[in-house]
Amino acid sequence: DGVLTGARFITLAGARAFIGTDDRVVVLDLDDPLSPKVEASWPANKPTAVAIQFRYAFMTDSSGFQVIDITDTKAPRAVSDASIKLDDARNVDVARTYCYVAAGRDGVVIIDVEKPESPKEYARYTDNGLINDTYDIKVASTNASLFGYVADGKNGLVVLQLTDPERVPGFYGFSPQVKPVVIARKQTAGPALSISKPLDRDRAVDETGNQVSVFGRLGSRPFNLEEMRKMFLTERGKVWTVE
């Protein structure tokens, strides 16, 4: 029925696929991979990317950055007043309490999503204008430091150090304050357009509750999706909150 006409990207999150088309993002249920089913969709203005973390989808489109509540994936909801205007948002990655947007000539735009329904622009980083054609960014940790790997189009690959013990107090914390600085560059044969996703280590289950690692203790297992949802949803499917 043409629901995927104009498909331009796909983001996998467990047994679900989020596919961007010309005017919306479509959620596919891939629990039976040979019989995919359309679960839901939400409107978007030429979406370019989606990053998934817990109950939220962080989307970039021609309007900029937008937060979508996917607590119920059958009824995704754009969070009102949870958007940030960006001129050329091309891709997005999320790592704990920060989203990293590949923003073309504006370089890397870092957005604070500690409160996902109230995102705030944290910083724009261009290395004094040298990062100016950003197509993609992926964030990963090596040992105890956080790095950003940037596909900067005509400028090739750029590596950012985001945290380190010398510049970032509390860098061992859950989500320390990030302070980007360029530590390496590599000119590529052609424009650098994309960065592959790194390995997710120490991960027990995927976004749909499927076990992805083997535990080293006899009889142990991670919680499944139903068990996890009971920790943050009431019997009526509402999110637990405190006043």
Segments (PLM) and residue ranges:
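Feature marking well-ordered beta-strand scaffolds used for ligand recognition
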Residues: 1-243
